Structure formats: structure tokens, C-alpha cells
Amino acid sequence: MKNRDVIVKAGSRVLKSTPRKLNLVAGLVRNKKVSFATVQLRFCEKKAAGLIRKVLNSAIANAQNYGLDIDNLYIKEILIGKSLTLRRVCPKAMGRANRVSKRYSNITVKLGEII
């Protein structure tokens, strides 16, 4: 099987989940066929699986717009990146305060075609 370069891609920005949690789920479906990946993400019970599945479905829809056969598509790359970080203050004893970081993420899914 020869693999061509990236055919289609889709992305989502500023998702309320940390990159670390998204990377755990993205590792399940990297370099897998699209049909297998959608089933894996559907039955994974993590919130991150739902976020990645939405972006994957968007990439599949983009592939259909180009008239590509979905059975020959595989996930070439899933890129998880850092987005903005909200910083909050959590009051502690004796007048102290700790900082709490609320992290956001970006997802990019690139699909390739198996020839």
C-alpha cells in the first residue's frame, strides 16, 4: 500500500479540554482507518473522544465534498496543540492564594488516502 500526502484536513480551536487529555485519546486512532477510528471514538467514554470525533466527522465531510471514497481514507495526523490558558485564583489559608490554570486546546485532523 502506498500512501499519498494529506488529502483533506479539518480543525477546531479553543476547546475546553487540556492537551494532555486529548493526546491520550488521539493516540488510540493515529494512523488508523477512518471507519475503525470512528467506532473507537464512539465507544470511548472520555469527553475528549467526543471532541476528536466531531473534528474527524468534519474532515470526513470535507473528503466527501471532494468526491473521495471514505473506505480508502486513513488518519495521517492528529495534531493537538496548546491554546489559551485562563488563570484563576484559589484562596488559601492565612491570606495566601494559589493560581489555577484552565487550559484550552486546538485539534487538527489530516486525512490521507490509501492507494
UniProtKB/Swiss-Prot annotation:
Please give the GO cellular component terms listed in this UniProt entry. Answer: cytosolic large ribosomal subunit
Reading the lineage from the top rank, the first entry is: Bacteria
**Listed SUPFAM superfamilies:** Ribosomal protein L22 (SSF54843)
Q: Where is the signal peptide?
A: none
Q: Which Pfam families match?
A: Ribosomal_L22 (PF00237)
In the record, biological process GO terms are: translation
A GO molecular function term, named singly, is: structural constituent of ribosome
What the record says about family reads: Belongs to the universal ribosomal protein uL22 family.
Q: How does it assemble?
A: Part of the 50S ribosomal subunit.
Functional description taken from the UniProt entry: This protein binds specifically to 23S rRNA; its binding is stimulated by other ribosomal proteins, e.g. L4, L17, and L20. It is important during the early stages of 50S assembly. It makes multiple contacts with different domains of the 23S rRNA in the assembled 50S subunit and ribosome. The globular domain of the protein is located near the polypeptide exit tunnel on the outside of the subunit, while an extended beta-hairpin is found that lines the wall of the exit tunnel in the center of the 70S ribosome.
Protein known as: Large ribosomal subunit protein uL22
Q: What is the originating organism of this protein? A: Wolbachia sp. subsp. Drosophila simulans (strain wRi)
Q: State the encoding gene.
A: rplV
